[in-house]
Amino acid sequence: MIEEDLLIDEKDHNNEDLVITSIRPNSLENYIGQNDVKSQMMLFIKAAKKRKDTLDHCLIYGPPGLGKTTLANVIANQMSTGFKKTSGPVLERAGDLAAILTKLDPYDILFIDEIHRLNYVVEETLYPALEDFKLDIIVGEGLASHSVQLELPPFTLIGATTRVGMLTSPLRDRFGIIQRLQFYNVEDLKMIVERSADILDIQIESKGALEIAKRSRGTPRIANRLLRRVRDFADVKANSMIHQDIAKEALIILKVDEAGLEQLDRDYLSIIMNKFSGGPVGLDTLATSIGEERGTLEDMVEPYLIQQGFIMRTPRGRSITDAAYAHLGLINGLKVNDLFNQ
């Protein structure tokens, strides 16, 4: 695998990805939400620039779609440094990592997405690079093999993960800065929707933006996706103007309810209610019943349902709460109303 294959070029994407790239903020001032993280990172960046030093290695974690990659890009822009992007699964061998590290310029930022998926050999190779900016590689084979230590330019590693608990302690402890991204509130999401609409030249009223924000499950990526789909609906039905009624109508067609739950979320809750008497039920059993992978439920479904108080995770499995029954219009397991019965 050549070095160029190991890096992700953000310009080499389809049109949808280019749209996503175009609406990303490029500075902390334009980065909406996550105020505690922003204020801390601004302080750390100013201190590093004042010392003319590298920024400490950063670990950013949180549920998918909250802006980990965007924040890494913003940090690179604020530091006025180069930005190289790769991902844990791509780095299969120590040589893959070495090919990237030896091409870095001084003070560059290397971003590794899904860093929890680094294999053991690559992770071990990374340790001296993080601590001492040195790289130990094995040259030759068999009895003729020997270790060579290479000097690396000073750099900053930014790792992103949705599963911080899967990182080994030695790797986690080598990050000087650890930031947790949290779900966004509705007001911040409304601002994100309005900002994206302005960049994409989408006509939207304030109440229309609020309706999309309320159904975006606290996640900017979902807010921007829903904005683009509601735009499609408005282009056909409402002369391209997104107002509240059009947003509601479009989101009902997309089967996104007022709490932001999509069909997979409702299937998850309904199966626990109807097949397993409200739980508890093991995740593997639940995944089989739904026909989805365990990781999909853990990463994409459960975090928001837990945050909204719809499910509980216990040692015996998953159980639903009274709030879930109330939201789906059920009392003691009997359906009294179906929002999407049409």
UniProtKB/Swiss-Prot annotation:
InterPro entries associated with the record: AAA+_ATPase, AAA_lid_4, DNA_helicase_Holl-junc_RuvB, P-loop_NTPase, RuvB-like_N, RuvB_C, WH-like_DNA-bd_sf, WH_DNA-bd_sf
Domain notes from UniProt: Has 3 domains, the large (RuvB-L) and small ATPase (RuvB-S) domains and the C-terminal head (RuvB-H) domain. The head domain binds DNA, while the ATPase domains jointly bind ATP, ADP or are empty depending on the state of the subunit in the translocation cycle. During a single DNA translocation step the structure of each domain remains the same, but their relative positions change.
EC number: 3.6.4.-
Domain of life where this protein originates: Bacteria
Catalyzed reaction equations: ATP + H2O = ADP + phosphate + H(+)
List of residues binding Mg(2+): T69
Chief subcellular location: cytoplasm
Lineage: Bacteria, Pseudomonadati, Pseudomonadota, Gammaproteobacteria, Candidatus Pseudothioglobaceae
Pfam family, one: AAA_lid_4
Gene3D superfamilies: 1.10.8.60, P-loop containing nucleotide triphosphate hydrolases, Winged helix-like DNA-binding domain superfamily/Winged helix DNA-binding domain
Region feature Small ATPAse domain (RuvB-S), mapped onto this chain: 185-255
Subunit structure: Homohexamer. Forms an RuvA(8)-RuvB(12)-Holliday junction (HJ) complex. HJ DNA is sandwiched between 2 RuvA tetramers; dsDNA enters through RuvA and exits via RuvB. An RuvB hexamer assembles on each DNA strand where it exits the tetramer. Each RuvB hexamer is contacted by two RuvA subunits (via domain III) on 2 adjacent RuvB subunits; this complex drives branch migration. In the full resolvosome a probable DNA-RuvA(4)-RuvB(12)-RuvC(2) complex forms which resolves the HJ.
Region feature (Head domain (RuvB-H)): 258-342
Binding of ATP, residues: I23, R24, G65, K68, T69, T70, E131, D132, F133, R174, Y184, R221
Functional note: The RuvA-RuvB-RuvC complex processes Holliday junction (HJ) DNA during genetic recombination and DNA repair, while the RuvA-RuvB complex plays an important role in the rescue of blocked DNA replication forks via replication fork reversal (RFR). RuvA specifically binds to HJ cruciform DNA, conferring on it an open structure. The RuvB hexamer acts as an ATP-dependent pump, pulling dsDNA into and through the RuvAB complex. RuvB forms 2 homohexamers on either side of HJ DNA bound by 1 or 2 RuvA tetramers; 4 subunits per hexamer contact DNA at a time.
Ranges where the record places region Large ATPase domain (RuvB-L): 4-184
GO cellular component: cytoplasm; Holliday junction resolvase complex
Phosphoprotein listed as a keyword: no
Organism: Vesicomyosocius okutanii subsp. Calyptogena okutanii (strain HA)
Protein's recorded name: Holliday junction branch migration complex subunit RuvB
GO molecular function: ATP binding; ATP hydrolysis activity; four-way junction DNA binding; four-way junction helicase activity
UniProt keyword terms in alphabetical order: ATP-binding, Cytoplasm, DNA damage, DNA recombination, DNA repair, DNA-binding, Hydrolase, Nucleotide-binding
Family per similarity comment: Belongs to the RuvB family.
Positions with a binding annotation for DNA: R294, R313, R318
Subcellular localization(s) per the UniProt record: Cytoplasm
The gene coding this protein: ruvB
GO biological process terms on file: DNA recombination; DNA repair
